[in-house]
A protein has these predicted regions:
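Acidic, proline/glycine-rich low-complexity IDRs
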Residues: 1-44, 81-179
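Amphipathic, interaction-prone secondary-structure segments
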Residues: 33-85
Length: 179
Protein backbone atom coordinates (compact mmCIF):
# COMPACT_ATOMS: atom_id res chain seq x y z
CA UNK A 1 0.00 0.00 0.00
CA UNK A 2 1.32 3.42 -0.97
CA UNK A 3 0.75 5.94 1.85
CA UNK A 4 0.72 9.66 1.09
CA UNK A 5 0.70 12.51 3.61
CA UNK A 6 -0.63 15.97 2.87
CA UNK A 7 -0.39 17.43 6.34
CA UNK A 8 1.45 20.70 7.01
CA UNK A 9 4.49 19.70 4.96
CA UNK A 10 5.09 16.42 6.79
CA UNK A 11 6.79 13.80 4.60
CA UNK A 12 5.17 10.66 3.17
CA UNK A 13 4.54 7.85 4.00
CA UNK A 14 2.19 8.44 6.92
CA UNK A 15 3.87 9.98 9.95
CA UNK A 16 4.06 8.40 13.36
CA UNK A 17 0.99 9.40 15.41
CA UNK A 18 3.14 11.39 17.86
CA UNK A 19 4.00 13.80 15.02
CA UNK A 20 0.31 14.61 14.48
CA UNK A 21 -0.80 14.67 18.11
CA UNK A 22 0.04 18.37 18.79
CA UNK A 23 -2.34 19.48 16.04
CA UNK A 24 -5.19 17.91 18.01
CA UNK A 25 -4.13 17.86 21.66
CA UNK A 26 -1.89 20.94 21.89
CA UNK A 27 -2.82 23.94 23.97
CA UNK A 28 -6.08 25.64 23.04
CA UNK A 29 -5.61 28.37 20.47
CA UNK A 30 -2.59 26.54 19.00
CA UNK A 31 -4.44 23.47 17.78
CA UNK A 32 -4.64 23.04 14.03
CA UNK A 33 -2.18 25.87 13.37
CA UNK A 34 -0.18 25.07 10.26
CA UNK A 35 3.02 26.59 8.93
CA UNK A 36 1.39 26.77 5.51
CA UNK A 37 -1.62 28.95 4.76
CA UNK A 38 -4.29 26.25 4.87
CA UNK A 39 -6.93 24.69 7.09
CA UNK A 40 -6.89 21.30 5.39
CA UNK A 41 -4.95 18.05 5.47
CA UNK A 42 -5.24 14.54 4.04
CA UNK A 43 -3.92 11.04 4.51
CA UNK A 44 -4.18 8.88 1.39
CA UNK A 45 -3.81 5.12 0.88
CA UNK A 46 -3.41 3.85 -2.68
CA UNK A 47 -3.83 0.11 -3.05
CA UNK A 48 -5.46 -0.49 0.33
CA UNK A 49 -6.96 -3.80 1.42
CA UNK A 50 -4.33 -5.84 -0.44
CA UNK A 51 -4.98 -4.27 -3.85
CA UNK A 52 -1.62 -2.54 -4.36
CA UNK A 53 -0.80 -4.89 -7.26
CA UNK A 54 -3.87 -3.73 -9.24
CA UNK A 55 -3.88 -0.83 -11.67
CA UNK A 56 -5.81 2.37 -11.17
CA UNK A 57 -8.91 1.13 -13.05
CA UNK A 58 -8.55 -2.57 -12.29
CA UNK A 59 -10.23 -2.73 -8.89
CA UNK A 60 -7.53 -1.03 -6.80
CA UNK A 61 -8.95 0.34 -3.55
CA UNK A 62 -7.88 3.86 -2.63
CA UNK A 63 -8.77 5.60 0.60
CA UNK A 64 -8.80 9.35 1.14
CA UNK A 65 -9.03 10.71 4.68
CA UNK A 66 -9.68 14.44 4.47
CA UNK A 67 -9.50 16.81 7.43
CA UNK A 68 -10.66 20.43 7.69
CA UNK A 69 -9.98 22.17 10.97
CA UNK A 70 -10.69 25.40 12.76
CA UNK A 71 -9.19 26.26 16.17
CA UNK A 72 -12.56 27.12 17.73
CA UNK A 73 -14.92 24.46 16.29
CA UNK A 74 -12.75 21.39 15.84
CA UNK A 75 -12.21 19.14 12.84
CA UNK A 76 -14.44 17.81 10.08
CA UNK A 77 -13.34 14.38 8.82
CA UNK A 78 -14.26 12.68 5.57
CA UNK A 79 -13.38 9.03 4.90
CA UNK A 80 -13.75 8.09 1.26
CA UNK A 81 -13.18 4.55 -0.03
CA UNK A 82 -12.91 4.28 -3.81
CA UNK A 83 -12.85 0.95 -5.63
CA UNK A 84 -11.28 2.07 -8.91
CA UNK A 85 -12.90 0.88 -12.10
CA UNK A 86 -16.02 -0.42 -10.36
CA UNK A 87 -17.93 2.76 -9.63
CA UNK A 88 -18.32 1.54 -6.04
CA UNK A 89 -17.44 4.41 -3.76
CA UNK A 90 -18.29 4.96 -0.12
CA UNK A 91 -18.03 8.26 1.70
CA UNK A 92 -18.56 9.04 5.37
CA UNK A 93 -18.40 12.31 7.26
CA UNK A 94 -17.88 12.95 10.94
CA UNK A 95 -20.98 14.35 12.61
CA UNK A 96 -21.52 15.96 15.98
CA UNK A 97 -24.71 18.00 16.11
CA UNK A 98 -27.48 17.82 13.53
CA UNK A 99 -28.94 21.10 14.84
CA UNK A 100 -25.97 22.89 13.22
CA UNK A 101 -26.22 21.46 9.72
CA UNK A 102 -27.70 24.76 8.53
CA UNK A 103 -24.80 26.95 9.73
CA UNK A 104 -21.53 27.05 7.88
CA UNK A 105 -17.79 27.47 8.04
CA UNK A 106 -16.18 28.93 4.90
CA UNK A 107 -12.85 27.17 4.47
CA UNK A 108 -9.59 28.54 3.07
CA UNK A 109 -10.66 27.72 -0.47
CA UNK A 110 -14.17 29.17 -0.26
CA UNK A 111 -16.12 25.96 0.26
CA UNK A 112 -18.92 25.91 2.82
CA UNK A 113 -19.05 23.06 5.35
CA UNK A 114 -21.88 22.53 7.83
CA UNK A 115 -20.66 23.22 11.37
CA UNK A 116 -22.61 20.20 12.64
CA UNK A 117 -20.04 17.98 10.88
CA UNK A 118 -17.13 19.28 12.99
CA UNK A 119 -16.12 17.24 16.04
CA UNK A 120 -13.96 18.17 19.05
CA UNK A 121 -10.20 17.94 18.59
CA UNK A 122 -9.89 15.12 21.13
CA UNK A 123 -12.42 12.98 19.24
CA UNK A 124 -10.78 13.79 15.91
CA UNK A 125 -7.42 12.73 17.34
CA UNK A 126 -8.80 9.34 18.39
CA UNK A 127 -10.18 8.82 14.87
CA UNK A 128 -6.96 9.91 13.14
CA UNK A 129 -4.85 7.66 15.37
CA UNK A 130 -7.20 4.73 14.73
CA UNK A 131 -7.08 5.40 10.96
CA UNK A 132 -3.27 5.26 11.03
CA UNK A 133 -3.17 2.13 13.20
CA UNK A 134 -5.68 0.20 11.05
CA UNK A 135 -4.14 1.01 7.64
CA UNK A 136 -6.97 3.28 6.60
CA UNK A 137 -10.05 1.48 7.91
CA UNK A 138 -13.04 3.63 8.82
CA UNK A 139 -12.46 4.52 12.49
CA UNK A 140 -15.05 3.18 14.92
CA UNK A 141 -14.19 5.65 17.70
CA UNK A 142 -16.47 8.44 16.41
CA UNK A 143 -19.94 8.79 14.91
CA UNK A 144 -20.15 8.92 11.11
CA UNK A 145 -22.88 9.72 8.64
CA UNK A 146 -22.85 8.12 5.20
CA UNK A 147 -22.49 10.56 2.33
CA UNK A 148 -25.77 9.33 0.83
CA UNK A 149 -27.53 10.23 4.12
CA UNK A 150 -26.18 13.77 4.37
CA UNK A 151 -28.65 16.56 3.74
CA UNK A 152 -27.94 18.17 0.35
CA UNK A 153 -26.98 21.44 2.05
CA UNK A 154 -24.20 19.95 4.21
CA UNK A 155 -21.64 20.88 1.52
CA UNK A 156 -23.32 23.51 -0.70
CA UNK A 157 -22.18 24.10 -4.25
CA UNK A 158 -19.26 26.55 -4.37
CA UNK A 159 -20.55 28.62 -7.28
CA UNK A 160 -21.15 32.28 -6.32
CA UNK A 161 -24.79 32.18 -7.42
CA UNK A 162 -25.56 29.26 -5.13
CA UNK A 163 -23.44 30.45 -2.21
CA UNK A 164 -25.25 33.79 -2.20
CA UNK A 165 -28.23 31.92 -0.72
CA UNK A 166 -26.10 30.71 2.20
CA UNK A 167 -24.17 33.86 3.13
CA UNK A 168 -26.43 34.74 6.04
CA UNK A 169 -25.72 31.33 7.56
CA UNK A 170 -21.90 31.55 7.43
CA UNK A 171 -20.87 31.96 11.06
CA UNK A 172 -17.10 31.36 10.75
CA UNK A 173 -14.53 31.97 8.05
CA UNK A 174 -10.95 30.89 7.61
CA UNK A 175 -8.40 33.36 8.94
CA UNK A 176 -4.66 32.77 8.49
CA UNK A 177 -2.85 31.92 11.70
CA UNK A 178 0.04 33.90 13.15
CA UNK A 179 3.13 33.97 10.93
Amino acid sequence: MHKITRFDGLPSPWPEPKMLEPYFLGEKGRRWVFEKDTDQAALVAEGAEGTEHLGRNEGRVDIDFFLVGHPSIGVQLTHRRIKRGSGRNESFSSISNTAYLDRYYRDRYGSLIAIGLFIPFEDAWRAVKEFLETDGALPKSIEWIAGRDLPPDAFPDTSPLVQRNYLSRVVLEYRPGPS
